[in-house]
Structures are given as C-alpha cells and as structure tokens.
Amino acid sequence: MKILVIGGTGFIGPPVVGELQRLGHRVAVFHRGKSTASLPPDIEHIIGDRQQIAEAQQNFEAFAPDVVVDMILSSGPQAEALMHAFHGVTRRIVAISSIDVYRACGVTHGIEPGPLEPLPLTEESALSNYNKSSGFIGGV
C-alpha cells in the first residue's frame, strides 16, 4: 500500500514510518522540512505547512496514497482542511489524536478551568471545552 503520514517526524512518527516501511508499504511523509528526525533513506518527503495543507494537494495527488495517517490533527478546522485536501485523493484517512482532546491537557496548561483529572486518562475522561463545542470529537 501507499501510505502518506502527516507529521511523521515528531516523537511517535519515525517509529510508525519505519514500521510501515518494514511491513513493505511505500511511505511518504508530509512535514515542514525542519526536523532532524531519523527516517529511513528511501522515504518520500512532501514538504509543506500543515496550516496550508491545501497548497500541497498536487503533491498528494501525485503520490496517490491508499491511506493517509494524520499524526498531528488537533482541531476541527484542521480536520475540515484535511478532508478538503484529500477529497478525491484517497478513500481512507486515519486520524491519530493526542491528549489535547481531553480537558486535562487544558487544565494542566492553564487554558481550561477545573480540577486536575485523575490518571490514567481514558476514552471516558472529560473532553476539552473547545473540542466539545466545535463538534470535532465525534464529528469527523
């Protein structure tokens, strides 16, 4: 399969990219080109900014991924831009989320009110107010 990984140069990305390649997939990574991440030498690179993802649409079409794995999706507007950028390009998008969807992240960073959440966080933990109000969670 041809798999495009968005944000594959961070903490989790390189092991994911390496494992996908080890399993025999052709992998491309969409990133800003600013990371010194250790990626396998024959990985394809599509350089661009996540905030202007539509600008790379021709490159996405040229790679023609069977699956897109988004490692850095963090908001409703980003999800909408992702869906538009890949409409007609791929039939499958996998969104990898993070602790940012939970209220605990906002409380810890001082941007959401409330007490600290008990650990460990689970899928039953309270969601961030932004993600609840934007319809991002459960709406994509």
Regions from the language model: what does each represent?
Residues 28:
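Conserved beta-strand positions in the Rossmann-like core of class I SAM-dependent methyltransferases
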Residues 3-25:
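N-terminal Rossmann NAD(P)H-binding glycine-rich loop of SDR-like oxidoreductase domains
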Residues 35-95, 101-108:
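NAD(P)H-binding glycine-rich loop region in Rossmannoid oxidoreductase-like domains
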Residues 1-10, 79, 129-133:
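Short, charged N-terminal helix-start/capping segments
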Residues 80-140:
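Conserved Rossmann-fold NAD(P)-dependent oxidoreductase catalytic core, especially the SDR/UDP-sugar
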Residues 1-2, 31, 91:
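Secondary-structure boundary/capping motif
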Residues 8, 32, 98:
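Cofactor-binding loop segments of dinucleotide-utilizing enzymes, especially the Rossmann-like FAD-
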